[in-house]
Swiss-Prot record:
<dbReference type="GO" id="GO:0015940">
    <property type="term" value="P:pantothenate biosynthetic process"/>
</dbReference>
<feature type="binding site">
    <location>
        <position position="110"/>
    </location>
    <ligand>
        <name>3-methyl-2-oxobutanoate</name>
    </ligand>
</feature>
<feature type="binding site">
    <location>
        <position position="42"/>
    </location>
    <ligand>
        <name>Mg(2+)</name>
    </ligand>
</feature>
<feature type="active site" description="Proton acceptor">
    <location>
        <position position="180"/>
    </location>
</feature>
<keyword id="KW-0963">Cytoplasm</keyword>
<comment type="subunit">
    <text>Homodecamer; pentamer of dimers.</text>
</comment>
<comment type="similarity">
    <text>Belongs to the PanB family.</text>
</comment>
<feature type="binding site">
    <location>
        <position position="81"/>
    </location>
    <ligand>
        <name>Mg(2+)</name>
    </ligand>
</feature>
<dbReference type="GO" id="GO:0005737">
    <property type="term" value="C:cytoplasm"/>
</dbReference>
<dbReference type="InterPro" id="IPR040442">
    <property type="entry name" value="Pyrv_kinase-like_dom_sf"/>
</dbReference>
<feature type="binding site">
    <location>
        <position position="81"/>
    </location>
    <ligand>
        <name>3-methyl-2-oxobutanoate</name>
    </ligand>
</feature>
<keyword id="KW-0566">Pantothenate biosynthesis</keyword>
<protein>
    <recommendedName>
        <fullName>3-methyl-2-oxobutanoate hydroxymethyltransferase</fullName>
        <ecNumber>2.1.2.11</ecNumber>
    </recommendedName>
</protein>
<keyword id="KW-0460">Magnesium</keyword>
<dbReference type="GO" id="GO:0000287">
    <property type="term" value="F:magnesium ion binding"/>
</dbReference>
<dbReference type="GO" id="GO:0003864">
    <property type="term" value="F:3-methyl-2-oxobutanoate hydroxymethyltransferase activity"/>
</dbReference>
<dbReference type="InterPro" id="IPR015813">
    <property type="entry name" value="Pyrv/PenolPyrv_kinase-like_dom"/>
</dbReference>
């Protein structure tokens, strides 16, 4: 998938599938699938490193995981999150951070928020030839300011703000925008108001595409079960079954067998 395909898919009313990915083996699996695009999300800080929020993601962490995913990925378009405060200092510092991610293998970056400074930064990056995906609604890097993981845009004032933010991000040059945890009717209204495609997570079926976290949709963990996640596999259960089978076979001397020995 190439960057121009995002707008083409919206025009042709073909849904976009996006999935997070954080390591080389997972990327090799995704490469053999029909997934359109991959996000090396700052959710790696939680899903892989065990932190309680995405705020702990660093540019070094994002760079390392982007390199790993890029080595294994195939035809999918690769986007990497700019981590917490990665664009809140000088524009020069922001460009340097983005440069590191692109050199690591990313084809675009995703930036959360739509305040004036953020939109100016996005415009600056786009003018420099760097593709940027926006992100509105529940923005995990602002979780403390938002007061927790809550649905956004539930009243008319918040809804109008999100509509304005989406329009501003489009004007700033974003090629797509993620809409996270907003009422489905609002997400559909935002989607219909934009030329660029929207990617939803917890935003209903009316967006131009969907994104889920690898560990969530494969059932690799069971402690975090948001309403918007559908588990397509029970990987944790199968992994535990395999581990226990290995232990049993070692104890009963069924492994290694002759076929596994020299």
């Amino acid at each position: 998938m190439k960057i121009h395909d995002f707008k083409i898919k919206k025009q042709e009313q073909k849904k976009i599938s996006m999935l997070t990915c954080y390591d080389y083996p997972s990327a090799c699996i995704v490469a053999e699938s029909n997934i359109d695009c991959v996000l090396v999300g700052d959710s790696v800080a939680m899903a892989v490193h065990g932190h309680p929020t995405t705020i702990m993601a660093t540019i070094e962490m994002m760079e390392l995981h982007t390199q790993a995913v890029a080595r294994g990925l195939g035809k999918q378009f690769l986007i990497t999150d700019l981590p917490f405060l990665g664009h809140k200092s000088s524009q020069g510092h922001t460009v340097e951070n983005v440069k590191r991610l692109l050199q690591a293998g990313a084809q675009a970056v995703k930036i959360e928020g739509a305040d004036k400074d953020t939109c100016q930064t996005i415009s600056h990056l786009v003018n420099a030839g760097i593709p940027v995906m926006g992100h509105i609604g529940l923005t995990p890097q602002s979780i403390h300011q938002l007061g927790g993981y809550k649905v956004q845009g539930k009243n008319s004032e918040q809804a109008e703000t999100l509509l304005q933010q989406a329009a501003t991000l489009e004007q700033a040059g974003c090629f797509a925008v993620v809409i996270e945890c907003v009422p489905q009717e609002l997400a559909k209204t935002i989607t219909d108001s934009l030329v660029i495609p929207t990617i939803g997570i917890g935003a209903g079926p009316g967006t131009d595409g969907q994104v889920l976290v690898w560990h969530d949709m494969l059932g690799l963990q069971t402690s975090f079960n948001p309403k918007f996640v559908k588990k397509y596999f029970r990987a944790k259960d199968h992994f535990i079954e395999a581990l226990n089978s290995y232990v049993q076979q070692v104890q009963q001397m069924h492994f290694p067998a002759n076929e596994h020995s020299f």
